[in-house]
């Protein structure tokens, strides 16, 4: 696409379009406009950008960075059964520009939702566009769980970022900064160690734009008519900055904006989310408890008591912390993150699983629970059999403690 290289003519104003309320925010270089259909940044003095947007040449000279909501795109499509392609997105974007009297070239992206936050740091502005299908629901007492009305097979969590730099940087430097920002964003989310079912739906449709100013001399119309917009021979500010220090500031800006975006959607993780990720359900643990009853027949009343006791025990902050530590230890050992321990070699005198399981059983029901824990640990009925070595004994201790408690009542 050469959408942003040519200077555009003023588009026609369509007076028959229903007026939509828009939010406008001034930026250091440009203006952000957002309504229910789109979010776009307009800079009549032009951006030089490098991006991975759907409608983009990679390197572009444009006046508008546009993000259209999927709802708007869906409403204006002729055939929703076919996948959206770049040509159709371009046509819909052109129509939107015409309806809203938007001038100039553009790069564009479709996005499910277009909530946003702005983080500004002198010469660096980060606009994070947020699309989120997750919510935190109350489950029991203080226990909460992340869920989605779409179900996790269809849910999305995406954070698109537009990083605007109040400098005139060369395409080469923009590409370098794009790589820096992309890598830092990936490192940040990886460092969160989110549960697998959440991590799987995270940032599958995200995007990144790095935008800078054009050198001032290129804004002169006589200069453009005589020289043209030759981005290879412009006078850039690359040598005027401390690159190492600027890269550190970009990295910090990306991390802080991601942290603030997570805070905006209130996405935080608790023990039940880790249980979901491991495929451990309360009902499965109840079945384990019932399977090892001696001289007592399972009953609905007993199952209900065990379920309540399990939830009560998981709500205990001490047990909660032990369970999460076991989940994280299992993951770290599987992925070889602990240099001194290789579980593939079956190290001798290594039994943190038994220590954690025994501690949990004892915390719930005292020393009496340890006998049940040893039996559960040895026989590993039901879901315990399929868990990893750390989690198997950890949850054996949880179930043993809860069973001991309800049978003592």
Question: Regions from the language model: what does each represent?
Answer:
Residues 2-264:
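Alpha/propeptide regions of enzymes that mature by internal proteolysis
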Residues 304-375:
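Long, charge-patterned amphipathic interaction tracts in eukaryotic proteins
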Residues 371-409:
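Glycine-rich, aromatic-bearing surface loops/beta-hairpins
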Residues 246, 250, 254, 258, ...:
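Hydrophobic face of amphipathic alpha-helices
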Residues 189-196, 261, 265, 293, ...:
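Long, hydrophobic, amphipathic alpha-helical segments used as structural scaffolds
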């Amino acid at each position: 696409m050469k959408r942003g290289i040519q200077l555009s003519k003023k588009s026609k104003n369509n007076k028959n379009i229903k007026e939509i309320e828009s939010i406008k925010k001034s930026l250091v270089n440009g203006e952000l406009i957002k309504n229910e259909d789109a979010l776009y940044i307009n800079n009549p003095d032009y951006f030089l950008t490098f991006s991975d947007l759907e409608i983009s040449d990679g390197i572009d000279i444009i006046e508008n960075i546009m993000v259209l909501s999927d709802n708007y795109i869906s409403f204006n499509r002729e055939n929703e059964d076919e996948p959206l392609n770049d040509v159709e997105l371009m046509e819909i974007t052109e129509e939107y520009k015409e309806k809203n009297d938007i001038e100039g070239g553009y790069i564009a992206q479709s996005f499910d939702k277009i909530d946003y936050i702005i983080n500004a740091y002198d010469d660096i502005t980060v606009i994070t566009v947020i699309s989120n299908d997750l919510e935190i629901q109350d489950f029991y007492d203080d226990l909460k769980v992340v869920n989605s009305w779409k179900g996790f097979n269809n849910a999305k969590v995406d954070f698109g970022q537009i990083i605007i730099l109040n400098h005139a940087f060369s395409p080469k430097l923009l590409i370098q900064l794009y790589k820096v920002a992309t890598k830092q964003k990936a490192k940040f989310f990886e460092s969160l160690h989110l549960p697998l079912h959440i991590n799987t739906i995270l940032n599958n449709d995200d995007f990144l734009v790095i935008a800078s100013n054009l050198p001032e001399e290129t804004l002169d119309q006589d200069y453009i008519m005589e020289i043209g917009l030759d981005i290879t021979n412009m006078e850039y500010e690359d040598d005027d900055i401390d690159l190492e220090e600027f890269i550190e500031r970009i990295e910090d800006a990306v991390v802080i904006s991601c942290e603030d975006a997570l805070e905006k959607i209130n996405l935080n993780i608790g023990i039940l989310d880790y249980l979901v990720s491991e495929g451990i359900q309360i009902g499965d643990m109840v079945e384990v408890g019932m399977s090892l009853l001696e001289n007592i027949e399972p009953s609905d009343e007993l199952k209900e008591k065990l379920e309540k006791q399990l939830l009560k025990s998981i709500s205990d902050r001490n047990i909660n912390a032990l369970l999460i530590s076991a989940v994280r230890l299992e993951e770290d050992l599987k992925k070889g993150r602990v240099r001194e321990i290789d579980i593939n070699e079956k190290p001798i005198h290594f039994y943190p699983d038994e220590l954690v399981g025994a501690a949990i059983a004892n915390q719930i029901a005292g020393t009496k629970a340890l006998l049940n824990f040893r039996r559960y640990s040895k026989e590993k009925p039901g879901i315990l059999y399929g868990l990893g070595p750390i989690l198997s004994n950890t949850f054996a201790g949880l179930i043993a403690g809860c069973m001991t408690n309800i049978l003592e009542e």
